[in-house]
Swiss-Prot record:
This is Geranylgeranylglyceryl phosphate synthase. It comes from the Archaea. It comes from Pyrobaculum calidifontis (strain DSM 21063 / JCM 11548 / VA1). It is found in: Cytoplasm. Pathway: Membrane lipid metabolism; glycerophospholipid metabolism.
Amino acid sequence: MKLVDYLLEGSVKHFTLIDPDKSVDYLKIVRYALDAGTDGILVGGSLGIRETQMTQVVKDIKSVAHVPVVLFPGSPSQLTEEADGVLFLSVLNSLDPYFIIGAQVQGAVLIAKHFPRLEVISTAYVIVGDGGAAGFVSMSKPIPYARWDLAVAYALAAYYIGFGAVYLEAGSGAPQPVPPEMVRAVRKVFPRVLIVGGGIRSGEAARQLARERPNVIVTGTLAEEQPEKLAEVVRAIKSSL
């Protein structure tokens, strides 16, 4: 099954984000996530990981994981064909063209020449609220939590341009997640893959988001700091259906 079909199929899925630059013992976190019932692993997010390191990290994870392992690259240097796919990110609300199209031009050439078997999902990355490190590094102008209408406008633009996915990102360690009302509004206008992440620290927060029917809910900081709570989050997502 193609990765995009897996993401679209069935109920809301939970993915665990592994940042190998932050997580020395990333396999321990992966095992916690697998035991909790996670549906997939995202790998990336850092600026300090090279291709050779990423290749080894993905190999290590795939040696223990029975779920898809997908790249979430912080730069074009974080590509490897060992993964099952890549979220080919364009930060739509960045103020720097590099993060909208510059890095993507570099990454596209690398994929075409060196990683042609890697499944690519074009992803409109939209920074919301606090934005966290992702918003700072990408020089974004985050969408305020209360302005769901702006999120809808970006989602519509992503749809008409032809993106295969929209990722609403509140940022690593954000004080609160993307509001459920914003997810609901975007879901109504974007029928493709919808991903939500950032600031999700409890089962109840995950349950409220899952009720709005995104395709994927991502937790990263929680996995790093309190991996024992992953089971609570996954149960909440599954029980919301």
